[in-house]
Amino acid sequence: MPKYARVVTLAAVGVLLAACGGTPEHGAGEAREALRTARQQVLAAGSARVDATMTTGKRLTSRSTGALSWADGVEGTLTVRVTGGELAASTRALGGDPSQTRFLPDAQYTRMSDRFAELQGGRHWIRRPYDTRGDLTPADSLKALIGAEDVHRVGRQTVRGTRATHYRGSAGRGHIDVWLDARQRLVRRTQHVGDFTVTVHYRGYGAPAAAERPAARDTVDFAEVTGAG
């Protein structure tokens, strides 16, 4: 395993990229109409409180909580806790537990431990630019799902005590599942690619979200850490 594989995994937590079985109940037209309404509401709200879980096969699981804004670029701060997996102990040693990920319009910044900083010239924060091809915000994911050829309604389910309608469709190499409440608000989103799964629960739409930019002298680029630069 590469020396910094656990660092790569931890830094990926903030990307916010399982699913359950089901077959199409209704046509794509009805599904797309509901998803368009949900996307309009997400865009209008501009922010929300989030509770996200990430699973990377058997290697690592984590939970991230906080608030994110997408009204003018992505901004917000998440507290990240490692919850299990084969790399849990070593990830905690390098990344700290809890750690923190800050989202700013240009990139996400992940706080690492003093042990990590000793290996990186005293720098604690990893700066990772966004993949512009990815689904960075809930509105992006809903847009991708609206455009999916196989988008469909799976059925009705309960999400943390709220009755919701479940929709699913393919996106790139994986698929997206979303759950909308009775008012067509997004309450849960799951994205699955290979053995990488992220599930995000949303509440408190319109909640304040902010992030402070780490000092440049305390920041190292992701490409430098992984040797990709």
Model-derived features with residue positions:
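Short, hydrophobic/aromatic-rich segments at coil-to-beta transitions
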Residues: 44-51, 73-77, 88, 160-168, ...
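Amphipathic hydrophobic-ligand
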Residues: 59-65, 93-96, 195
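Solvent-exposed helix/loop surface patches that form functional interfaces
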Residues: 120-159, 215-217, 228
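Gly/Pro-enriched, hydrophobic low-complexity segments
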Residues: 162-218
